[in-house]
Amino acid sequence: SETAAELWGVDGVSLVKRLTGGTAFADVAVDDSIAAGSRELVVGASLNGKLFLAYDSSVDRLHVYDPQLGTPRVRRVSLATPAAPTVANTGAGAYAATIRYYRVRWIQLNSGVEVRRSEAGASVTFTPSGSGTHARITQPAVAGEGETHWAIEASEDNASFYVLTEPATATTTYDDNETVADYSEE
């Protein structure tokens, strides 16, 4: 609607500002600053209640103003791709020595609703020793882009992956004791 209209601008020192229903521009928090000398090349498009901004910055990613965030700001679109997790044997028992593959994705939830999800990171190949009870998957270093959870995916063929669980990022390990045949039933 016209009452929700906003005017956006970039000033001479690449500060992003917005005018909404008033007469004064307000500064907008920006995760990645606009590169010097390229402020006149900022391009924006509104979609689904957000303002997407394409501009030159130190990070080669599209940006978006998301008014639904707890602290509205211009953030990167999507999340950084995670590194591969590490996997090790744990416990004493008879966990089958069958080759399997693990990979992870970052997820950001806001009030239980998924806001964004990263691309899958590289997979890691793991064959249990046969004398443990679980394969312990350890989270890679968190990207620090607002991710709240991580999806742990497993595969028996390194092609078809299935989500095992999506714990909060504060939970840094997960113990998998499923057989590879059960992955597709998760």
Residue ranges and their predicted role:
Residues K17, G22-E186:
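Disordered, low-complexity "stalk" and linker segments at domain junctions of extracellular
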Residues S1-G12:
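Beta-strand-rich domains and repeat architectures in extracellular enzymes and scaffolds
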